[in-house]
Every structure is written in C-alpha cells, then in structure tokens.
A protein has these predicted regions:
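Amphipathic alpha-helical segments within well-ordered protein domains
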Residues: 82-83, 142
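A structure-centric signal for secondary-structure junctions around beta-strands
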Residues: 64-66, 81-82, 133-135, 185
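PLP-dependent aminotransferase class I/II
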Residues: 2-5, 9, 17-21, 26, ...
Length: 209
C-alpha cells in the first residue's frame, strides 16, 4: 500500500486529491493520510474495490475519506451481475456533482427542487456520462449486501487459518496485520523466501507441484 511518506514525496502545487487504494483488502493508514490531506487542503478518495468489509480502527473503509469508490465487477467480493460500482460520500455538494455526472450532467436540483412551467424542461446543466445501474443489477447487489457480513466473517476466518499454517512453514512469509486493521482478505497473500528454499525450488515450482 501507499504510505503517508510516499504520498508526501509526490505532492506538488497541482495536486488536488489523494487516491488511496486498500489493496487486496488491507486498509491504508488512514489517520496519517487524512492528516496529510488536511495539511495540504486535499481531497481523499478511498479506492475500496477490493476491500468490502474492511475496517480501520473500527471505521469502515469508504467512510473515512471524502469519497469512497467501490467495484462490483464479477471478480470482486460482491458483484452486480458482471460490472458495476458505487460511490459513497457524506458531503452533499460532492454527492450532487456525482449524481449529475452519472446521468449525463442532469441536475438533481432542477428535477426535484425546482418549479417548472408546463412543457419542455431543460434538466442537463453540466457534462457527464452514463453510469446508471440497471434495476436488475441493483436487485442482485441489494441481495448480496445483506449477505456481506456473513461472507466477510467466513472469508476472514479462512484467510487466518491459511496464514496460521503458513507462518509455521520454513521458506514462507506472512505479513503481520496490525490489531487496528480488519482485513477484507480479498487476497490471501503468502510470500516465498527464495533464500530459504532448496536448490532448484522456486515459487513457480511450489505452485506447480
């Protein structure tokens, strides 16, 4: 994962936001990243595509930064029947911009909060694209959301069983997850220590045999 130090080294006068990726389900160090963002007046966008269910110090990922982005692609923790995604935020002004962008620049205020005379209504006030989810996809997603807690618990339990065994195997290395991190275990990484393997053995040979 990126670190506050690596982010700081990349910040310039042109920097507007920090995109932190909770890679493989392991949350970034959000406290220090948010402090850094406040120092430079930057937005923080959490990429939670691989981190459904993960938490940082008891807070769900996607709820710490200014915006959370989620993937529902077919190979992610949950899916909406192929492709899909979600954006979350507690900032209403950002939400209105996101809402408009996903529907060809259509204004939420113009549709729901403005009186119009009879006849044609011009509702598109900015640029945008089509990111509207179909109703069938939404149904699939809503059902899977109800199962997320159960899936998360089972996946994490399986991952820790694998890591527990791998820790006792010479030639293998397992990353230590801090107590304040709740991993989503989208990936269950176990690393090979090449210098501890016998001659002619490698990561690829282990996988093959």
């Amino acid at each position: 994962n990126i670190t506050p130090a690596s982010i700081r080294s990349m910040i310039t006068r042109k920097t507007k936001a920090i995109v932190c990726v909770h890679l493989a389900g392991w949350p970034c160090e959000m406290d220090k990243i948010m402090e850094l963002a406040n120092e430079f007046d930057l937005f923080v966008i959490e990429d939670c595509a691989q981190a459904h269910g993960a938490k940082f110090k008891g807070k769900a990922v996607g709820s710490i930064g200014h915006i959370g982005c989620w993937s529902f692609c077919q190979d992610k923790i949950m899916t909406t029947g192929g492709e899909g995604g979600m954006v979350t935020t507690n900032d209403e002004s950002l939400w209105r911009k996101i809402w408009a962008y996903k529907d060809h620049g259509k204004s939420y205020e113009a549709i729901y909060e403005r009186e119009h005379p009879e006849g044609f209504r011009w509702l598109h006030e900015t640029f945008g694209s089509n990111y509207r989810m179909t109703e069938m996809q939404a149904v699939i997603g809503r059902i899977q959301l109800k199962k997320m807690n159960e899936w998360h618990s089972k996946r994490l339990d399986n991952a820790y069983k694998i890591w527990s065994v791998a820790k006792g195997c010479k030639g293998l290395r397992v990353s230590e997850v801090p107590d304040y991190i709740e991993h989503a275990a989208y990936k269950c990484y176990v690393f090979v220590k090449p210098d501890e393997l016998k001659e002619s053995w490698s990561r690829d040979r282990i996988i093959k045999e």
